[in-house]
């Protein structure tokens, strides 16, 4: 199971719609759960922080990384911080950190971008034509 744990609520309708679209698409490939919390607490399982200082992957590399983690771990949680990022005490409990880009994105938009990248990775793993 893949859990996406994000700080704070999504406010913008267009962000919610984008997230709903990719969450629906992802159900064909994996059990993906999206959770919003005001305060982050680190659950059990393998925890990956989305952090601008984390390791960067291109889409094919991320698909390989995700496939490997899905084979090794029963539960994978990706943590997305709020406007202030992920608190240091939470980062210290994460096994790994990955970055979507060296650029900084609004935390609300990161949710859609990351869901799209998860979907893209799943289609790459299945050899489908979404990623060209």
Regions found by a protein language model. Name each.
Residues 81:
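Rossmann-fold NAD(P)-binding glycine/threonine-rich loop
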Residues 1-22, 26:
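N-terminal beta1-alpha1 ligand-phosphate binding loop
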Residues 91-132:
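Structured adenosyl-cofactor binding patch, chiefly the S-adenosyl-L-methionine
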Residues 24-77:
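S-adenosyl-L-methionine/SAH cofactor-binding core of RNA-modifying enzymes
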Residues 8-11, 51-54, 102:
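Structured beta->alpha junctions
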Residues 16-19, 59-60, 91, 111:
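Conserved strand-to-helix beginnings and helix N-cap segments that scaffold or border functional pockets
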Residues 86-89:
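Short, glycine/polar-rich helix-capping loops at beta-to-alpha or helix-loop-helix junctions
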């Amino acid at each position: 199971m893949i859990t996406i744990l994000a700080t704070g609520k999504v406010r913008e309708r267009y962000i919610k719609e984008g997230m709903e679209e990719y969450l629906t698409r992802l159900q064909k490939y994996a059990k993906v759960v999206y959770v919003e919390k005001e305060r982050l607490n680190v659950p059990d399982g393998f925890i990956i922080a989305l952090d601008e200082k984390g390791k960067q992957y291109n889409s094919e590399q991320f698909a390989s990384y995700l496939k490997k983690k899905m084979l090794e771990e029963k539960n994978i949680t990706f943590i997305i911080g709020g406007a202030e990022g992920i608190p240091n005490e939470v980062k210290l409990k994460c096994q790994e950190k990955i970055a979507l880009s060296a650029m900084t994105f609004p935390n609300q938009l990161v949710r859609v971008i990351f869901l799209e990248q998860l979907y893209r990775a799943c289609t790459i793993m299945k050899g489908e034509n979404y990623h060209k």
